[in-house]
Amino acid sequence: MSDYGIALGMIETRGLVPAIEAADAMTKAAEVRLVSREFVGGGYVTVLVRGETGAVNAAVRAGADACERVGDGLVAAHIIARPHKEVEPVLTMEQK
């Protein structure tokens, strides 16, 4: 199944615990699919979710709030409503 046209939500954290907390909150808050977790380096972890734009927006908000409750774990939170088709290969590079 192609994810082209489906929203992408991203949360980057300092450490694994805030990342797990964010992933848990995001998947509980809205109908989104957890698609990837990347260890970026230096203790940073990025969590990616996909779904309809409204659901991804709600999920990323919930994930960011959960991260902030854990401590100083939130680095960034961002949503791309419809990633361009040229961006899709970049998103799947690390998953292979």
Curated annotation (Swiss-Prot):
Listed GO CC annotations: carboxysome
Pfam entry (one): BMC
Subcellular localization(s) per the UniProt record: Carboxysome
Keyword set includes RNA-binding: no
GO biological process, one term: carbon fixation
Keyword Lipid biosynthesis recorded: no
UniProt keyword annotations, A-Z: Bacterial microcompartment, Carbon dioxide fixation, Carboxysome
Gene3D superfamilies: 3.30.70.1710
Regions that span the bilayer: none
Induction cue: Induced by growth in low levels of dissolved inorganic carbon (at protein level).
Domain BMC per the UniProt entry, residue ranges: 7-92
PROSITE patterns xrefs: BMC_1, BMC_2
Domain of life: Bacteria
Assembly: Homohexamer with a small central pore. Forms a CsoS2-CsoS1-RuBisCO complex.
PANTHER family: BACTERIAL MICROCOMPARTMENT SHELL PROTEIN PDUJ, PROPANEDIOL UTILIZATION PROTEIN PDUA
Family statement: Belongs to the bacterial microcompartments protein family. CsoS1 subfamily.
Entry's free-text remark on domains: The tight homohexamer forms a small pore which is positively charged.
Role of this protein: One of shell proteins of the carboxysome, a polyhedral inclusion where RuBisCO (ribulose bisphosphate carboxylase, ccbL-ccbS) is sequestered. Assembles into hexamers which make sheets that form the facets of the polyhedral carboxysome. The shell probably limits the diffusion of CO(2) into and out of the carboxysome.
UniProt name for this protein: Carboxysome shell protein CsoS1A
